Amino acid sequence: MDPEGYAYFVMGLEMVAPGSSGVVNEWRDSYTWLPEKDGEYAEAWSEMHGDPNQARRVAYSEDVDFAKINLIRAYGKAWEHKWADLTISRLNAWGINNVGASGSPLTRIMNSPLGKYCQYPCFHFVGVYPRTKVSVFRDFPDVFSKEYEEESSKFAACLEPIKDIPFIVGYFMTNEPEWAFIEDLEISEMLLAHPEHLVTKDVFIEFIQGRYADIEAFSQAWNLKIDSFADLLTPIPEARKLFKAARCDLDAFSYIMIEQYIKVPALKCKEVDPNHLNFGMRYPYIAYANQTAGHQYLDVFDINDYRYDPKEYINWIGSLVNMPVMVSEFHHGSLDRGLPVTGIRGVRTQEERGVAYRYYVERGASTDYFVGSVYFVFSDQPVLCSNYQENYNIGFVDICQMPHREITDAVRETAIRVYNVHAGKASNYDHRPDIIPLNAC
């Protein structure tokens, strides 16, 4: 519910911005025309320096935004304010009550048209999630180290400028951590295989000593010949294959590691900003129960979830965490007009996109745990790809700001009835969409 006690079911839309930038440096020869960088359309140019830890994003791109060029042509110097007026009226008409995180930091929220000209409810990204110089696996840090605690304090300090802004509903600590893309990952197994002496290895040894009377009992249980617990500092590859007891111990310590991964920055964030809700990690999916470790340090358990029917999945996650669950990304694209790629989930037509939206959101709303979702994304992507190397036909509007009425009308229908569905006073929309195979890479 909101601060005044009214029910608030998130009907969100991600990256509500005037345009959608496309990469130039890799595709320059494919453009028949590009504007001068210091000319009339200078505001359409930008540069992006990617996070080197995100393999899915290009490291550097020089971008141009033809949607923004169209707005400048239409409205001249007042283009930004005109776009904001138009978009705010549309969001209200569609029943959208949250504009997502929009790739914030603070400057994106406050300096975007929707931040300048209105106070539209939104979320916030805290910053770059804390890392340690030596990681356990991919971007998973040495979570019991002093370094991790110090980096978490720096991370949480990023909330200081926004802690009193009332139209920010809450914050995400990160988005789709790279380590979480391995469906059968046992993070403690990666710890034992690591060649360096990490602080978390010392904690693991203490954990094992607490479970076994002596080194002989441990060696027998794990089918591992070592002379002392200190020998566990020596890399042990594929430890899950040793014996059943090893799998049980590793699973238990993985939970402890993931819990610490969430706990340390979450507590630091709450110290700095007690006013906003912590929505967590935007995991790409939950493949095993240990991924929910640390949920008690969050206010809402959030996931990105690309499927057609979330009901069973939401109920499963809700049963693990026993707290509100939100979806921060989902979409369904089509190929009957516009861009040539469906996105992560495809349906046959634009009309079926509306069917898919209603089916997804209302099926979720019929569960006890679901508190809303944020559709990805507001605008169709550039035909020659964004800096995430995507050109998906998934927007609410096209490059000329023309709405895809088939989906926006459907969103409005769901917005009108979703509170009754959530309260059990109405049945959810139950027309399954006509699914087609995705053609995204």
Language model features with spans:
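Active-site-adjacent substrate/metal-binding segments within catalytic domains
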Residues: M1-N111, Y129-D164, P237, F243-K244, ...
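Conserved, mostly hydrophobic/aromatic
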Residues: G5, L91, V99, Y171, ...
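Polysaccharide-binding and catalytic clefts of secreted carbohydrate-active enzymes
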Residues: W27-W79, I165-Q291
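Active-site clefts of carbohydrate-active enzymes
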Residues: Y60-L71, Y129-P141, L233-D251, P284, ...
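Substrate-binding cleft/loops of secretory-pathway carbohydrate-active enzymes
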Residues: L106-L114, W179-I187, L277-Y313, S379-N391
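Substrate-binding cleft of secreted/luminal carbohydrate-active enzymes
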Residues: P166-G170, T174-E176, F330, R345-D398, ...
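Aromatic-rich peripheral "rim/lid" segments of glycoside hydrolase catalytic domains that contact
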Residues: S188-D202, F376-C441
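Glycoside hydrolase catalytic-domain groove-lining segments
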Residues: A252-G343, R358-A365
